[in-house]
Structures are given as structure tokens and as C-alpha cells.
Amino acid sequence: DPAWKSSPLHRAILQSYLAWSDAVSSYVDKVDLDEQDRARARLLSGILVDALAPTNALFGNPAALKKLVDTGGESLWSGLKNYVTDLVENGGMPSQVDSRPFKVGKNLATTPGAVVFRDKMFELIQYKPTTAEVWRRPIVITPPQINKFYSLDLTPEKSLVQFLLSEGFQVFCISWRNPKPEHRDWGLEDYVDSVANAVDVACKVTGSDDVSMMGACSGGITSCAYAAREAARGSSKLKTLTLAVCTLDPATADETTLGSLITPFTIEAAREH
């Protein structure tokens, strides 16, 4: 925004903020800490510096001030309404998207399909073929346990499921149950058993001896654990495995932002909650 240069007040705010940001970063780099503690300090100080950016406050944001004037105060009123909505409907956390326009089955996850299997941990969806002929071997999709099955079937224009169907594949997708406190003992072995059940059902429905599998994120970790177990047992039910956004080597965790927060204490705290 030109105001950062033309307005003496905003120019002073900007320069003060940048100088303070550099000072914080320099201090973290110089203080006597081991590498993991330094990584944590960088992360936390970065969050603090970003949170206190002048643009996060109305009077420190020239673009917001201009919009306030141009709209006759409507932008401020709209922001206050969003704030109240977040307080009432989102636990006080800022909403990242407006979820009101999205309705599952209406304009989200619209690919026709049916649940062909259900147990305490998941449902298995078989999607309706869109081609006259289909490949015998089905594809079983294992989505993340912390996401929805329709992350791969958002809209007709943004749907891996619809693309696979158009290529003649028989597509099955796991829909994980949202666990509650009473399900806290569900572990990796339980989720691997669920993947095995999904594969068995897909084979039974299609008459195929094996499947191709795609695992995404934590679903990819589960798929790999399933693949390793099947290989150890000499099973040939898994023909191919495709992984998406899936980290398998925990040794690289220290090189990530979240990796700096991994300690015995934080792991135990996560398990308790």
C-alpha cells in the first residue's frame, strides 16, 4: 500500500516493526541454546512477531482504514459480525472459510456412490462406474483419519474420484469415523485391520484377487503399514500402492516446523487429549 511510504505515521510504524522483528530474530540466533530449543524459539518468536504485525490491527493497516472510509463503516461492521459468528459458532477461533455455501451431497462430494460395508471404525463407499467397461482390479482409497473422504471428491472439476471413474477404474473409498473419547485406545493396528477389511470387501464385490491402493497423508502411513504386514505374511492382495503428501521417515521430523515441538512431554500430552 502506498501509505507505507507516503504517511509519516505508517512509515514510522513499519520501520519500527521491522527493526524489532530483526532484533528478535538476532537474539534467538545468538542466545545459548541447543539446536532443538533454538528451533522451538524461532518458531514461537516467529508466531509472536507475525501476531504483532501492524497490519493485524485496524489503525496499523492503511488498506483497512481506506476500506473503512470507502464503505462508510460497512467493512468494520462486517468484520464485527464475523467476529461474533466465530465466537458463537467456532469456539472463538477465526474461520478460515465460510462453510455456509457448502453442503455435502449438494455441491460437495456429489459423485454417486453407495456404502457397501460399515463397522465401528469406518464405512466403505463404492462409487458408481461412469464407463461401459471397467478394469477388473479396483482402487481402494485410504484418506487421512483426520480429514473427510470427500477431500478427494470436492466438486466435479476438482475430483480425483471422478477422474479415476472416467478412466474406467472401480473406485472404493474409506470414510473414517470421527473417534470419541471412548475410542482413545484405537491404535495403528486397529486402523490397519480396517484397511484389510476394506480390501477384502473390494475384492469380494469386484471378484478381483487384488487391489491397487492410494493412501493420503496419515492414510498413507496406515496403507504402508498394511502393505508391510501383507508382505510379511506372503499375501498378494496389494498390487500397487500410491502415496500422496505422506511422510514416512520420522528421522526427518526435526527438519520440519512441527518437528521442533516433538518431545516426550508433547507426545504424552497429545495422547491424553
Language model segments and positions:
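N-terminal cap/leader regions of alpha/beta-hydrolase-fold enzymes
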Residues: 1-273
